[in-house]
């Protein structure tokens, strides 16, 4: 590493420890030329997760946005915050697991509906009504019939 005082390229690490926040490694270095000491921080280069919208736009993955949609669907339902948080964690893991760190809103919506169907049927229907953008009561009724058929089999 280049010394900030004399621009010499060789140094030695005198001390190394985790930062107070735990998100970096703090290193004390000593220049082998001028013997002055300086501090460097080593951090993970975080590439943000991206969500590909239906119109092709990309925006940063927002955990709170996903959780907010789930909270609305589960309002006044017996679904714990821990379960919802776990579900958002699984979505986040799916994004981080993809090689390009991207996921489409379609994949997120389908994954959430699949999991909500198991968690709480009413929350599932509420979420589906917004996600699938039902235009009339017939579309809503068809989704309920589909859900009932799945329950019977």
Swiss-Prot record:
Names of the cofactor(s): Zn(2+)
Domain of life: Bacteria
Presence of keyword ATP-binding: yes
Cofactor note: Binds 1 zinc ion.
Any one biological process term the GO annotation gives: negative regulation of DNA-templated transcription
InterPro entries in the record: ATP-cone_dom, NrdR-like_N, RNR_NrdR-like
Tagged with keyword DNA-binding: yes
Alphabetized Pfam families for the sequence: ATP-cone, Zn_ribbon_NrdR
Residue ranges annotated for the ATP-cone domain, each copy included: 49-139
MF term (GO), any: ATP binding
unnamed ZnF: 3-34
Keywords assigned by UniProt, alphabetized: ATP-binding, DNA-binding, Metal-binding, Nucleotide-binding, Repressor, Transcription, Transcription regulation, Zinc, Zinc-finger
NCBIfam families in the cross-refs: transcriptional regulator NrdR
The protein's role, per its UniProt record: Negatively regulates transcription of bacterial ribonucleotide reductase nrd genes and operons by binding to NrdR-boxes.
PANTHER family xref list: TRANSCRIPTIONAL REPRESSOR NRDR (PTHR30455:SF2)
Protein family (similarity comment): Belongs to the NrdR family.
Annotated protein name in UniProt: Transcriptional repressor NrdR
Underlying gene: nrdR
